C-alpha cells in the first residue's frame, strides 16, 4: 500500500491524502459472508447518548471474520482476493478452502492473491498460517492472538500491529505487545504468523472534518468553550483555562480508566510505557 497525496485545489484537499488501494483485488464483498450493520448514533435502548461523538457516516455491511480457525486444521485454503473492509483499518483476505467453504481472515504483510495458507500445529511458519503458540519459534512476529485457548483472536488485529514472541516457559509464552507491555499467555492459545498489513494507514492525513463525518465521527467540543451549565470547565470572562484539573462533563477526573484489580493483571510481566515491573 502507498499513500496518494493531492494538489491543493481546495482547502479540504490541501495536505490531505488517501490510500491508493493498489493491493485490493475485488471491490464487492462475498455475499454469503456479510451481515447488516445498524448504527446506534451512540444511543442506548432508551434513546440516551451513552457514547459521545458518534453518528451518521456511510452505510456499511459487516464482514464475518474467522478469528478462530481451529475447525479448519489440516484443510488448505487459497487466497482468492484481498478486499477492503470499512469496519477495520486492516485489509481482509477471502479464503477458498479445499472443502468448498469460504471465509475471511485479516490480511498480514506478504499475503497476496493466489497464496496458500493453512492452520494447525504442523503448519509452516509463513504469513497467514495459524498455529498454537507452543509450535511457533521464539522471536517470530505474530498477530490475531488469543487470550484464552479457543476464545478467538483478541490481540493485534488492527493495521500495522504485531506481537513478538519473546520466549516460552512451562505453560505460558511471553509476548511483547504493540504498546510495549510484556504479557504471559497460555501456550495453547493460537496466533497467526506475520504482522497485520496496511501499516501506512497511520500516515493518512484526513484533511477535512467531512471525511471524519463519512466515518461516523462527530465533532469533539472542548469543555472550556462551553457554558457552566454544560461542563465544569465552562464559563468565565474571555478565554480561560478551566481553572481546575481536567475532568469529564460529569466531574470525574481524566484518566484512571483502567480497572486496577483485573484478574488477568497477574499475567502482566511489564507494564506498557512505564516499564515498571510487577
Swiss-Prot record:
Q: Which GO terms describe its biological process?
A: cytoplasmic translation
Q: Which of UniProt's keywords are assigned here?
A: Ribonucleoprotein, Ribosomal protein, RNA-binding, rRNA-binding
Q: Which HAMAP family does the record cross-reference, listed alphabetically?
A: Ribosomal_uL2_B
Protein name, UniProt field: Large ribosomal subunit protein uL2
Please give the residue ranges the record annotates as the region Disordered: 33-57, 224-278
Q: How does it assemble?
A: Part of the 50S ribosomal subunit. Forms a bridge to the 30S subunit in the 70S ribosome.
Q: Which organism is it from?
A: Mycobacteroides abscessus (strain ATCC 19977 / DSM 44196 / CCUG 20993 / CIP 104536 / JCM 13569 / NCTC 13031 / TMC 1543 / L948) (Mycobacterium abscessus)
Supply the gene name. Answer: rplB
List compositional bias (Basic residues) regions by residue number: 45-57, 269-278
Please give one Pfam family short name.
Ribosomal_L2_C
Q: Which GO terms describe its cellular component?
A: large ribosomal subunit
Q: Which family does it belong to?
A: Belongs to the universal ribosomal protein uL2 family.
**Which residue ranges have biased composition labelled Basic and acidic residues?**
253-268
Amino acid at each position: 500500500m502507498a499513500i496518494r497525496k493531492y494538489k491543493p485545489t481546495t482547502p479540504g484537499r490541501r495536505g490531505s491524502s488517501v490510500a491508493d488501494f493498489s493491493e485490493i483485488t475485488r471491490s464487492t464483498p462475498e455475499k454469503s459472508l456479510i451481515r447488516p450493520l445498524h448504527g446506534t448514533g451512540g444511543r442506548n435502548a432508551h434513546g440516551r447518548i451513552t457514547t459521545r461523538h458518534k453518528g451518521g457516516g456511510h452505510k456499511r455491511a459487516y464482514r464475518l471474520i474467522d478469528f478462530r480457525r481451529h475447525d479448519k486444521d489440516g484443510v488448505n485454503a487459497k487466497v482468492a482476493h484481498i478486499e477492503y473492509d470499512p469496519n477495520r483499518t486492516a485489509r481482509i483476505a477471502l479464503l477458498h478452502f479445499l472443502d468448498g467453504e469460504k471465509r475471511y481472515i485479516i490480511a498480514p504483510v506478504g499475503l497476496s492473491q493466489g497464496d496458500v495458507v493453512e492452520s494447525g500445529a504442523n503448519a509452516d511458519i509463513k504469513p497467514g498460517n495459524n498455529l498454537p503458540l507452543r509450535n511457533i519459534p521464539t522471536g517470530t512476529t505474530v498477530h490475531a492472538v488469543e487470550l484464552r485457548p479457543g476464545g478467538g483472536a483478541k490481540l493485534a488485529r488492527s493495521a500495522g500491529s504485531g506481537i513478538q514472541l519473546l520466549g516460552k516457559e512451562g505453560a505460558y509464552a511471553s509476548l511483547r505487545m504493540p504498546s510495549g507491555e510484556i504479557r504471559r499467555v497460555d501456550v495453547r492459545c493460537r496466533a497467526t504468523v506475520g504482522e497485520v498489513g496496511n501499516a501506512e494507514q497511520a500516515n493518512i492525513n484526513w484533511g477535512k472534518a467531512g471525511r471524519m463525518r463519512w466515518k461516523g465521527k462527530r465533532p469533539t467540543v472542548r469543555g472550556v468553550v462551553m457554558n457552566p451549565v454544560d461542563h465544569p470547565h465552562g464559563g468565565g470572562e474571555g478565554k480561560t483555562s478551566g481553572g481546575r484539573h481536567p475532568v469529564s462533563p460529569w466531574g470525574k477526573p481524566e484518566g484512571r480508566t483502567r480497572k486496577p484489580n483485573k484478574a488477568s493483571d497477574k499475567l502482566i510481566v511489564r507494564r506498557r510505557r512505564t516499564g515498571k515491573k510487577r
